[in-house]
Regions:
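Small beta-barrel nucleic-acid-binding modules, primarily SNase/OB-fold domains
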Residues: 2-113
Length: 113
């Protein structure tokens, strides 16, 4: 069942499916902002932060952060601009995502196709 009423929910509860139409991307594993409301961190993807660092206890890939972010943007849509803060604006098709619950910072961990 697709979880509705997303605009009123900051984090999608674990186990729920939901739609995400991407509107902007921060780095190679998210967050990805969705038209439907949630910000998601893509589960199963390891990417450096934009400053080149890696989080403690997480894999630290060799790929630089900008290349990883740009690859994610191409994967989920078409870049259409950039915000003053550095978010890449995207236009892409809706993805069906499965929530893994909260990963902090009002973000939902999710696998999406």
């Amino acid at each position: 069942m697709i979880f509705s009423a997303l605009l009123a929910v900051a984090v999608i509860p674990a186990g729920h499916s939901f739609l995400c139409t991407p509107t902007r991307v921060w780095d190679g594993d998210g967050p990805v902002w969705c038209t439907e409301g949630p910000r998601i961190r893509l589960s199963g993807i390891a990417a450096k932060e934009l400053d080149g660092t890696c989080s403690d206890g997480h894999p630290c890939p060799d790929t630089d952060a900008i290349s990883a972010r740009d690859a994610l943007v191409r994967l989920i849509g078409t870049p259409i601009g950039q915000t003053r803060e550095g978010h890449i604006l995207v236009r892409g098709p809706s993805m069906v995502c499965q929530s893994g619950g909260s990963v902090g910072g009002n973000r939902t961990a999710a696998f999406c196709v």
